[in-house]
A protein has these predicted regions:
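Phosphate-binding/switch region of NTP-binding enzymes
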Residues: 22-23, 28, 33, 45-47, ...
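Conserved inter-motif catalytic segment of the P-loop NTP-binding fold
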Residues: 5-6, 10-12, 16, 46-134, ...
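C-terminal regulatory/interaction module of P-loop NTP-utilizing enzymes
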Residues: 228-231
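Residues immediately C-terminal to the Walker A/P-loop in P-loop NTPase nucleotide-binding domains
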Residues: 41-42
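Hydrophobic positions on the alpha1 helix immediately C-terminal to the Walker A/P-loop
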Residues: 34, 38
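Short gly/ser/thr-rich secondary-structure transition/capping motifs
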Residues: 2-9, 164-167
């Protein structure tokens, strides 16, 4: 192990090379915006496969278009966006088919970094412990087979904003949490609805940089068609 290189930091200490990582948050807090922002940054160095199960290609195009100034954000060539149409996949061996499609797309596009938005489409039974555990085992096998780095977007049930984010806020089984190498979450400030914060919940590589005493503070802005989280400081959760 000592002879192998240390895993590279893919994005601000939140996700490291070779990890299966999870980003979770409540609805409408900007999970996909943050994930695309990560993909945009990483794709300037290497290919990134972004599996989008949330937006159509037109919705995605409009999200990154400044209508007033007629400016479209230009993503790096290394960012490859793909869509999964769940209606085109048989419910027999649904999860196996999804994983095979992801594997094939990653190989064809020469992408070792994969972002999957979101967990609901990947695993029909993600809230059922046994099925979720089996699915994550298959995903871990895929990671080990190709040395992929995989980020999975997930939901959290409605939560009290005054309470700190914990692993218990991740929707689904505890088994899901145990399989992830690292986990971080997006929360909304209960003092200012316009602000978001990012907190690390689980770390295996690196260190806890952004715990409850030092969360990343952001506001969501659009600059020349690029909708993104703009870092404005640090704070206690």
């Amino acid at each position: 192990a000592a002879r192998r290189p240390n895993p590279r930091d893919l994005y601000h200490g939140l996700w490291y090379e070779g990890e299966v990582c999870c980003l979770f948050a409540d609805s409408n807090l900007g999970k996909s915006i943050y994930a695309v922002q990560m993909a945009d940054a990483i794709a300037r160095q290497q290919n990134v496969l972004y599996m989008d199960c949330e937006l159509s290609d037109k919705q995605f195009q409009l999200r990154y278009y400044d209508v007033e100034n007629n400016i479209r954000h230009i993503f790096p060539d290394g960012l490859i966006r793909a869509e999964i149409d769940p209606e085109a996949i048989s419910m027999d061996n649904y999860e196996d088919t999804i994983i095979k499609n992801i594997e094939d797309a990653a190989i064809v596009t020469n992408s070792n970094v994969i972002i999957i938005d979101n967990l609901t489409y990947l695993c029909n039974a993600s809230d059922k412990g046994e099925a979720a555990g089996i699915f994550m085992m298959k995903l871990m096998q895929l990671k080990k087979k190709h040395n992929f780095s995989i980020l999975i977007i997930a939901h959290t049930p409605k939560r009290n904003l005054a309470n700190p984010i914990t692993q218990n806020d991740l929707a689904g089984s505890k088994k899901l949490y145990n399989f992830f190498d690292s986990v971080f979450a997006i929360g909304k400030s209960y003092k200012d609805n316009c602000l978001r914060y990012v907190k690390q919940v689980k770390v295996r590589a690196g260190e806890y940089r952004y715990d409850s005493d030092n969360v990343l503070i952001y506001e969501i802005v659009s600059d020349r068609g690029f909708l993104h989280f703009e870092h404005i400081g640090y704070a206690q959760e």
